[in-house]
């Protein structure tokens, strides 16, 4: 069976260090599908076309360049496909968004009410496939770093911006999307607490927090694994405003946050009896600018680059440092 993943509204990047590519590649691996990066007419030959909305999609469409002829042509290609499945999101929102743009200077003139009616008829029957619907051997649950710390055989229950503090307050057992907690479970929390919160408060008992983390995790599964927090990059690295908290990209100096990171890893390792998923130790001790250059996503980002994900053995052949 021929399976393909694509996005008619925006190209799926080809750059190896792209967060968006990493997200699409994980879906491709899980589904045993290929990626059509530019939504070519070749997708008509696939038995199933999966629509990837992008790692940062939250339910609303951002078409900064308008609905140009390329997007119009790509969507017309969808009309010729055998079967279409939308990944994670209800695709029917496209129609209302397009109707609002009819007649705009940035909208292709063939995007009309009649064309939108045809599109609506197509989209209303497209099913949604979510991570929790997959048949996989394990689950990685946590913040946006779950992409980097998930195993090849895992579903990913990702909650961007999630903190360990917030997860414990909610209850780890309540983070599994009302599905059975089965298989190998990896929890991925703590990086955002270190980046933004722990140094703001002088009364945080880190050991007590981690003990509660492990306690709640063991209430979910007998043998949980815990992702280490990510290394702390150099302070001058530019970050997107979406990663800011109270107007800043982090709180505390690089050296202070590294100290907290080292303490977190040490306590987590001891209290979990070594059940920790961690990149190579030298990442944490090397020059933070070289770490960012070699192992993080290209440009402004807080994430590990896809070639260095856990599923890729954390880059078993790392770049020259």
Residue ranges of model-derived segments:
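Alpha-helical cap/lid subdomain in secreted, periplasmic
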Residues: 43-113, 117, 128-134, 176-306
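Charged phosphate-binding loop/patch that engages nucleotide di/tri-phosphates or the phosphate backbone
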Residues: 118-132, 305-320
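Serine-esterase "nucleophile elbow" of acetyl-processing enzymes
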Residues: 2-38, 101-182
